[in-house]
């Protein structure tokens, strides 16, 4: 899992009008919640935030978030709201996490190679683009890259065929078909 550092400051403005003015000034409203604590309203520089979000392409990432220079909180991005027309950031929700506690994460799956069954006239069907894993946040892989070059016609790859580290548990049902080569 990726790790990045970000900074923010406590937000004093609330409501629709003040939020709009913040965004016009290049500031993105945000909030941190979780761990049984009250939600903490934040504000972040929109350009810096967007640059950092693009670095890790909005995938599973542990963010070390420093608020007003205090000790950093370990958070994950729970939700990113963006304008549907301009794609500008509207709001970011962070969820505080404990790095020693297992959680569920959705991990993307990509397939590489051309199955030999496709070369022989078969048709490739991809059924899953991600799987759900449960583990400590720093033990979660960034993605699964699975080589499917050896798949012949009428063969399939299931979730059970994915090799995992011993401290990572697959939540997605083992019988689910990930990819298959059909006639």
Swiss-Prot record:
Gene3D superfamilies: Ribosomal protein L25, beta domain (2.170.120.20), Ribosomal Protein L25, Chain P (2.40.240.10)
Keyword Signal on entry: no
Keywords per UniProt: Ribonucleoprotein, Ribosomal protein, RNA-binding, rRNA-binding
InterPro entries cross-referenced by the UniProt entry: Rbsml_bL25/Gln-tRNA_synth_N, Ribosomal_bL25/Gln-tRNA_synth, Ribosomal_bL25_b-dom, Ribosomal_bL25_C, Ribosomal_bL25_long, Ribosomal_L25_dom, Ribosomal_uL5_bac-type
GO annotation, cellular component aspect: cytosolic large ribosomal subunit
SUPFAM superfamilies with a match to the protein in the record: Ribosomal protein L25-like
Keyword set includes rRNA-binding: yes
Region forming the signal peptide: none
GO MF assignments: 5S rRNA binding; structural constituent of ribosome
CDD domains attached to this UniProt entry: Ribosomal_L25_TL5_CTC
Pfam families: Ribosomal_L25p (PF01386), Ribosomal_TL5_C (PF14693)
GO terms under biological process: translation
Subunit structure comment from the entry: Part of the 50S ribosomal subunit; part of the 5S rRNA/L5/L18/L25 subcomplex. Contacts the 5S rRNA. Binds to the 5S rRNA independently of L5 and L18.
Similarity-based family: Belongs to the bacterial ribosomal protein bL25 family. CTC subfamily.
Annotated protein name in UniProt: Large ribosomal subunit protein bL25
Organism: Desulfotalea psychrophila (strain LSv54 / DSM 12343)
């Amino acid at each position: 899992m990726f790790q990045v550092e970000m900074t923010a400051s406590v937000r004093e403005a609330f409501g629709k009008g003040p939020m709009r003015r913040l965004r016009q000034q290049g500031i993105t409203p945000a909030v941190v919640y979780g761990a049984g604590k009250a939600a903490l309203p934040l504000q972040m520089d929109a350009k810096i935030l967007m640059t950092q979000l693009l670095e890790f392409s909005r995938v599973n990432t542990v963010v070390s978030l420093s608020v007003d220079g205090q000790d950093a909180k370990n958070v994950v991005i729970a939700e990113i709201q963006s304008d549907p027309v301009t794609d500008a950031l509207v709001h970011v929700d962070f969820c505080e996490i404990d790095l020693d506690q297992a959680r569920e994460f959705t991990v993307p799956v990509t397939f590489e190679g051309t199955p030999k069954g496709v070369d022989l006239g078969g048709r490739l069907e991809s059924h899953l683009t991600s799987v759900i894993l449960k583990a400590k946040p720093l033990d979660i892989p960034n993605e699964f890259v699975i080589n499917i070059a050896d798949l012949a016609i009428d063969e399939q790859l299931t979730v059970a065929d994915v090799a995992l580290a011993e401290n990572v548990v697959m939540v997605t049902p083992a019988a689910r078909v990930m990819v298959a080569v059909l006639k």
